Amino acid sequence: MSLITDISRQAAKAAHQLALLDTETKNKVLLDMAAALRAEKAFIIKENESDLAAARDNNLAAAMVDRLTLNDERVEAMAEGIEVIVSLDDPVGQLRDITERPNGIKIRKMRVPLGVVCMIYEARPNVTADAGALCFKSGNSVILRGGKEALKSSQAIASVMHSVLAKHNLPEALISVIPDPDRGLLMELMQQRDSIDLIIPRGGEGLINFVTENSTIPVIQHFKGVCHLYVDKDADLEVAINLLLNGKTQRTGVCNALEGLVVHQDIANEFLNLCAVVLRQEGVKINADSQAATYFDNATVLGDDEFGEEYLDLEIAIRVVPSFAAAVEHIAQFGSHHTEVICTKNAATAELFQRSVDASVVTVNASSRFSDGSQLGLGAEIGIATSKLHAYGPMGLESLTTEKYLVNGDGQIRE
């Protein structure tokens, strides 16, 4: 039996055990995991430093290095994320749609775990803790296949979580890390449909496409984040500037950072003059249509079909549009169904934007940076689904479950 087949089968076996574990016990285990991450913070950061040194030697892109980096604050955030998960309702076993048929048969729907979830990701060691905790609380085993860039960090975090599982006499196979980033093993992993129920890839466009095209297992896509801010003709321009700066400059290498700015013609002159000052101060590189480019020094002029880039850097694309409808059309053409933002004081326009724009998160007068499981009350997130089956948007506990029918009778037969 190959390594991958063995890991997958052990994960499936462990999932059956976890599915029957009560909420109180799961929460005790998770609290111990949070405490263990804090206690082993120095060990985790030391292992992460090895990954960072290799990343620098390999000239890894700045955005990827940022995602790879762990420090006291980020390890603490992982622990706090687990504690939030503890505070959330356990979806497993929840009942709804309780009905009784005319023949006396009673019908219910019950939430149940998916089974085995496989995470495929790049330089994101925090995914190890987030996915491990979310899958555990929702009753799923998880198989973690991180990129070579984060291998030591991921193994360190997993080893800490394994020590807690052992303390509670639970199998390590509940949280498995593929120890070798070899592409051939990844291909084999994506064929384990008898053991793995769902694959969630998190990373660049190339990784998402590779997994989607090669997996025989259902895939939920966490696609790139080409997020826009649309500044409406009725916008509060001070609010708009704050949304722009927070969305673009707070942390550039994340999928909920702004990559596009769409401005209504009626306020373009006043607003873009403000943008020219603040974006220059922040060192943001400007790509723009011919009209918007005139407000900026050294702007790169984009053609009509050259928008839609995920920069993951201090860089943004700007377009002036003649109407609300044109803004929605631009977002439909160049967005990635991740997060879209409108700044407006017009309630009717805001409501129409939220109904019209096809994105997993649509915000009004609030930063794109809130498109995150921790910010939306989900605790940690396992991903932000930009495809619509079977989840859409930040995925928390409920997204890691499905429903089955419970049918109870007292001897009825079908006539």
UniProtKB/Swiss-Prot annotation:
PROSITE patterns assigned: PROA
InterPro entries, sorted: Ald_DH/histidinol_DH (IPR016161), Ald_DH_C (IPR016163), Ald_DH_N (IPR016162), Aldehyde_DH_dom (IPR015590), G-glutamylP_reductase_CS (IPR020593), Glu-5-SA_DH (IPR012134), GPR_dom (IPR000965)
Catalytic function, reaction form: L-glutamate 5-semialdehyde + phosphate + NADP(+) = L-glutamyl 5-phosphate + NADPH + H(+)
UniProt keyword annotations, A-Z: Amino-acid biosynthesis, Cytoplasm, NADP, Oxidoreductase, Proline biosynthesis
Pathway: Amino-acid biosynthesis; L-proline biosynthesis; L-glutamate 5-semialdehyde from L-glutamate: step 2/2
Organism superkingdom: Bacteria
CDD domains: ALDH_F18-19_ProA-GPR
Gene3D superfamilies in the record: Aldehyde Dehydrogenase, Chain A, domain 1 (3.40.605.10), Aldehyde Dehydrogenase, Chain A, domain 2 (3.40.309.10)
GO molecular function: glutamate-5-semialdehyde dehydrogenase activity; NADP binding
Subcellular location(s) of the protein: Cytoplasm
Pfam families (alphabetical): Aldedh
Major location (coarse): cytoplasm
This enzyme's EC code(s): 1.2.1.41
Manganese keyword on record: no
GO cellular component: cytoplasm
Any GO BP: L-proline biosynthetic process
Protein family (similarity comment): Belongs to the gamma-glutamyl phosphate reductase family.
Function, in words: Catalyzes the NADPH-dependent reduction of L-glutamate 5-phosphate into L-glutamate 5-semialdehyde and phosphate. The product spontaneously undergoes cyclization to form 1-pyrroline-5-carboxylate.
Name used for this protein in its record: Gamma-glutamyl phosphate reductase
Source organism phylogeny: Bacteria, Pseudomonadati, Pseudomonadota, Gammaproteobacteria, Alteromonadales
Encoding gene per record: proA
